[in-house]
Amino acid sequence: MDIDPYKEFGASVELLSFLPSDFFPSVRDLLDTASALYREALESPEHCSPNHTALRQAVLCWGELMTGCSWVGNNLEDPASRELVVNYVNTNMGLKIRQLLWFHISCLTFGRETVLEYLVSFGVWIRTPPAYRPPNAPILSTLPETTVVRRRGRSPRRRTPSPRRRRSQSPRRRRSQSPASQC
């Protein structure tokens, strides 16, 4: 089966693959961030959002993977084989978990639309030849201030502006203010 864990969130494995592997913080840092920001929601029996559910599943999956790795590490006698397993998990599975954790934490922190806009912006930036692109990559935390996110679907109904009143050409008279009305 070809399952893309980002599909229902409007992203894809391919879109996240534009971000270099060293972009993503360590699993430990991401777990600490998730715990600090969303512990109550993650531990709650209530359904909060699809991103909370996906984040919860990624945390549980990583825990199970570490349990399995500990078992393998304790039962493999050959140090070279043990090293191969550890490297494989850290390189392949670790990257996938780091991507998942980063994506869902970022969606909860900045909003899904902003994260998707960031992924597209970064993808365009990284594929543009260096001579034709700005020197610095887009930064997620600054996107909400610098980009306009357009929602898909129907555009909001535009209101026509109300007609302006015609102003007289004569200078406006100032009313004299009483001392009591000045603040």
Curated annotation (Swiss-Prot):
Subcellular location: Virion; Host cytoplasm
Post-translational modification: Phosphorylated by host SRPK1, SRPK2, and maybe protein kinase C or GAPDH. Phosphorylation is critical for pregenomic RNA packaging. Protein kinase C phosphorylation is stimulated by HBx protein and may play a role in transport of the viral genome to the nucleus at the late step during the viral replication cycle.
Biased composition range(s): Basic residues: 149-176
Chain positions of motif Bipartite nuclear localization signal: 158-175
Chain segments carrying region RNA binding: 177-183
Record flagged with keyword Phosphoprotein: yes
Alphabetical UniProt keywords: Capsid protein, Cytoplasmic inwards viral transport, DNA-binding, Host cytoplasm, Host-virus interaction, Microtubular inwards viral transport, Phosphoprotein, Repeat, RNA-binding, T=4 icosahedral capsid protein, Viral penetration into host nucleus, Virion, Virus entry into host cell
Keyword DNA-binding belongs to the record: yes
A GO term, aspect molecular function: RNA binding
Region span, 3 X 8 AA repeats of S-P-R-R-R-[PR]-S-Q: 155-177
Ranges for the Sequence repeats: 155-161, 162-169, 170-177
Residue segments, region Disordered: 136-183
GO cellular component, one term: host cell
Phosphoserine: residues carrying this PTM: S155, S162, S170
BP term (GO), one: viral penetration into host nucleus
Database matches in HAMAP family: HBV_HBEAG
Family note: Belongs to the orthohepadnavirus core antigen family.
Assembly mode: Homodimerizes, then multimerizes. Interacts with cytosol exposed regions of viral L glycoprotein present in the reticulum-to-Golgi compartment. Interacts with human FLNB. Phosphorylated form interacts with host importin alpha; this interaction depends on the exposure of the NLS, which itself depends upon genome maturation and/or phosphorylation of the capsid protein. Interacts with host NUP153.
Its job: Self assembles to form an icosahedral capsid. Most capsids appear to be large particles with an icosahedral symmetry of T=4 and consist of 240 copies of capsid protein, though a fraction forms smaller T=3 particles consisting of 180 capsid proteins. Entering capsids are transported along microtubules to the nucleus. Phosphorylation of the capsid is thought to induce exposure of nuclear localization signal in the C-terminal portion of the capsid protein that allows binding to the nuclear pore complex via the importin (karyopherin-) alpha and beta.
Name of the protein this chain belongs to: Capsid protein
Biological source species: Gibbon hepatitis B virus subtype ayw3q (isolate Hope) (HBVgbn)
Lineage: Viruses, Riboviria, Pararnavirae, Artverviricota, Revtraviricetes
